[in-house]
Curated annotation (Swiss-Prot):
Expressed in some of the meristems of arrest-stage cauliflower heads. It holds the Pfam family K-box. Transmembrane segments: none annotated. Its main location: nucleus. Homodimer capable of binding to CArG-box sequences. It is found in: Nucleus. It comes from Brassica oleracea var. botrytis. GO terms for cellular component: nucleus. The keyword Acyltransferase does not apply. This is Floral homeotic protein APETALA 1 C. One of its GO terms (biological process) is positive regulation of transcription by RNA polymerase II. Keywords: Activator, Coiled coil, Developmental protein, Differentiation, DNA-binding, Flowering, Nucleus, Transcription, Transcription regulation. Residues 88-178 form the K-box domain. GO terms for molecular function: DNA-binding transcription factor activity; protein dimerization activity; RNA polymerase II transcription regulatory region sequence-specific DNA binding.
Length: 256
């Protein structure tokens, strides 16, 4: 005999109802996972127990993206079919949608901070762990990239400073060479000026013996400036002195 169909009705026994809920929920999540893998579909399941406990399942993409996609499509369809008189109703629905989204984001934020984890299933905890691992990978990758860029920038600055120092050192050496050459040239000029000049060549002149014996001699002029006597005047004086005895002798002869 074939197995009879099970009548669908509410289970009155609380324990049996809880056990059945756990089994059917696990089977539902399993079927959702199978259809997502086999058919490459994005699946999101949200289940609340009779006590108000939340159970959810989503594919590799997070629940928020799937819900945002659902809201976007459903809102666009409602905008197409809604008459203009239902503007207030649409605003109310938009408010409810945004409010639910805010609550979901706040709950996920608490989960990311390690809070309110008691109501999460092992599968949900595993998904949360994967999301945190992915976020940590992105954070570490970005941090390593920033550190690598910082090291490259410091190396570039160090190379520029070394090149600048080398250029300055080269300029200093060239300047020192120029100063040394100028100093040597200056020393040579000073040495040439301090050397005594050679005496002028002597000219051999034939002079009269009398003139050789009567060379002008310097004399001391007390209380005045020294003035050199004119050579022509000195010569005339010498001639007068030499002729005076002869002149006196002649005068004596005439007197006799």
């Amino acid at each position: 005999m074939g197995r009879g169909r099970v009548q669908l009705k509410r289970i009155e026994n609380k324990i049996n109802r809880q056990v059945t809920f756990s089994k059917r929920r696990a089977g539902l999540f399993k079927k959702a996972h199978e259809i997502s893998v086999l058919c490459d579909a994005e699946v999101a399941l949200v289940v609340f127990s009779h006590k108000g406990k939340l159970f959810e399942y989503s594919t590799d993409s997070c629940m928020e993206k799937i819900l945002e996609r659902y809201e976007r499509y459903s809102y666009a369809e409602r905008q197409l079919i809604a008459p203009e008189s239902d503007v207030n109703t649409n605003w109310s629905m938009e408010y409810n949608r945004l409010k639910a989204k805010i609550e979901l984001l706040e709950r996920n934020q608490r989960h990311y901070l390690g809070e309110d984890l008691q109501a999460m299933s092992p599968k949900e905890l595993q998904n949360l762990e994967q999301q945190l691992d992915t976020a940590l990978k992105h954070i570490r990758s970005r941090k390593n990239q920033l550190m690598y860029d910082s090291v490259n920038e410091l190396q570039r600055k160090e190379k520029a400073i070394q090149e600048q120092n080398s250029m300055l050192s080269k300029q200093i050496k060239e300047r020192e060479k120029v100063l040394m050459a100028q100093q040597e040239q200056w020393d040579q000029q000073n040495h040439g000026q301090n050397m005594p000049s050679p005496p002028p060549p002597q000219q051999h002149q034939i002079q009269h013996p009398y003139m050789l014996s009567h060379q002008p001699s310097p004399f001391l002029n007390m209380g005045g400036l020294y003035q050199e006597e004119d050579p022509m005047a000195m010569r005339r004086n010498d001639l007068d002195l030499s002729l005076e005895p002869v002149y006196n002798c002649n005068l004596g002869c005439f007197a006799a």
